[in-house]
Amino acid sequence: MVLNEKQLIYGYDYYFRNENRPRSIVEVSEYNGESEIIINCTQLDDSSNSKYKTAKARKNVVNEWCDFLIKNPNVFTELTFCTRMPQELFDAVCSQKNLKKLYIKWGVYPDISKISNLVNLEFLHLGSGSSVGSIEPISKLENLVALTVENFQKILDYTPLTNLKKLESLTIEGDSFAPKNIHIDSIDFLEDMKQLRFFRFFTSVVKSKDYTPLLSLENIEHLSIKPSKEVNELYDDILKLPKLKYGTIVFNPEFYKK
């Protein structure tokens, strides 16, 4: 087991303000050889007095990063992107052979096929991926311990994730800020993911309306799930899961007792 108690309570990718974070930079020229870095190289200030006022200047910043990432495939173990992720930058990031942790806040990256190159990846957050067309490439990441996918509007079936036998934490949710639900066919895939210790499932609609696969999560310690008529009917049975101790199911019974 990899996840610690703090990660089980709050989520592996929860941001604590008092914790040290990697340095945040914009341009390749600011890089000082760190293995962990935050790169915010898009959505740059385009005002008239900015060095990035032209589209060409802004594009050059992204191009330089793409070139650097491809030509230096062994430098990073952790990368965070808090500004818009375009497809070409996503593909370049997937050149990083030693990457163990990747956090993408949001972007337009419909093709994630190259992520299967990141065989050492353990922690993956793909935010606001409404254009993503397939999650099959993620199923190749056999060392994944924790996965968050947000707003994958085109994905109806999450069965490919059952290949991730080391996965302890799984978050599947829509756009919680809009808010906008995602719709998936079923959560039957959970019956083959009994190793999960953390499962969060918000702003999501299950077309089958069958939530009984939740009862197969015999190792679950944190369970946070959107209330619904079907979930509420199962609430007492869910509480009997042998290792359950965190999440809205435990901390917010009023959500499910309406």
Predicted regions and their residues:
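Concave beta-strand-loop units of leucine-rich repeat
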Residues: 3-112, 120-189, 195-258
